[in-house]
Amino acid sequence: TPFVIFYVLAYVQWALNYILIGRDSKKLCYQFVLGDILSKVICLFFFILFPTTLTRPEITGTDIFSQLVRFIYSVDAPVNLFPSIHCLESWCCIRAAYKMNFKTEKRTNYYRVATILMSLGIFASTLFIKQHVIADVFGGIAAFEIGMILAKILI
């Protein structure tokens, strides 16, 4: 099941996003960092005032994929789900990919397509392994968009 690969690579994508955007434009990097911070403050507001949880299915299989899902469940508690920070960060990468320009149009387009595919995989994997529901995905996107609007006003 490919969702495991997406989770490992997600952290690389999130970090790489800031490195690349910082190399492209300092002002844009500052906006994205501030937008990210502000969007997480929005998430914290929801986590404190409107805590959410999710009842996950019992994983009874003994195969490697079942063991991996049990491991993910053990390190990622089913609380503070709305908005999804996994999806927020992935959406941040998509938005950044459309703001950055690499040396060639081919590289720029390759990065954009790779980022979209990776991020959509992360969105799907959080749903398919029962870490989030669809509202959490859209909540993460909305939180980031609001954070970016505020960041553009402040910077």
Predicted features and spans:
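Hydrophobic alpha-helical bundle signature of multipass membrane enzymes
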Residues: 1-80, 89-101, 111-115
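Membrane-embedded catalytic cores of phosphoryl/pyrophosphoryl-handling enzymes
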Residues: 71-155
